Every structure is written in structure tokens, then in C-alpha cells.
Amino acid sequence: MSTSELACTYAALILHDDGLEITADNINTICKAAGVEVEGYWPALFAKLFAKKSMDDLITNVGAGGGAAPAAAAPAAGGAPAAGAAPKKEEKKEPSEEEDMGFSLFD
């Protein structure tokens, strides 16, 4: 995305947030106030876009692109237990005799 395109996008969002009409003149005014040089056709293109499409519709449909994440991992091939199978009880690790005595070279 070019700097000009990004500046026009931000200008359109600012205008929408302030409740002002999104026109090429208003976009140019904001870009000039920000000190960004924009090619003359960008503000006109954005003004035409927002004349046809609502900014609210574009904002709410942002997540439409890209693939969805899988709901769950696929089970491994072979004899993997089913998801509904009872989980095995974890055995408690008993400390060895050396750990109980507290003898260590690095204590």
C-alpha cells in the first residue's frame, strides 16, 4: 500500500469519525494538514468509493478475507485414542532418596 493510499484511507476514517462528508476536497485538506503529498487521483477515487459504499459496511466486513482457522486439530493417524476416552491418571513422582537428604555439590 502506498503512502498516498494510506493517507487517503486515514483521512476518510477521520472524516467519518467526525461525521463529515467524505469528499475529495475534504480528503485533500486533511492530507495537506498532515503534510502528506498525495497524487491528485487518490482523493477522487476514495470519494467515489465512499459515495457508493458505506464506511460502516466496510469497517464491519474487514474480517471477510483470509481462511478460517481449523476448529480442532485432526487426530493422528493410527491407533490414537478417541477424544471422549477417559484420560489416564498422572502418576505422582516420588522423590528419590538423594533428594530427600539434601546432599548436593551445588547447594
From Swiss-Prot:
This protein's name: Large ribosomal subunit protein P1
Gene3D superfamilies named in the record: 1.10.10.1410
GO biological process, one term: translational elongation
Signal peptide: none
Low complexity biased stretches: 69-86
CDD domains: Ribosomal_P1 (cd05831)
Subunit structure: P1 and P2 exist as dimers at the large ribosomal subunit.
Region (Disordered): 67-107
GO MF annotations, alphabetized: structural constituent of ribosome
Entry GO terms, CC: ribonucleoprotein complex; ribosome
Pfam families: Ribosomal_60s
UniProt xrefs under InterPro entries: P1/P2_N_sf, Ribosomal_P1/P2
Alphabetically ordered keywords of this record: Ribonucleoprotein, Ribosomal protein
Job description of the protein: Plays an important role in the elongation step of protein synthesis.
Family, per entry: Belongs to the eukaryotic ribosomal protein P1/P2 family.
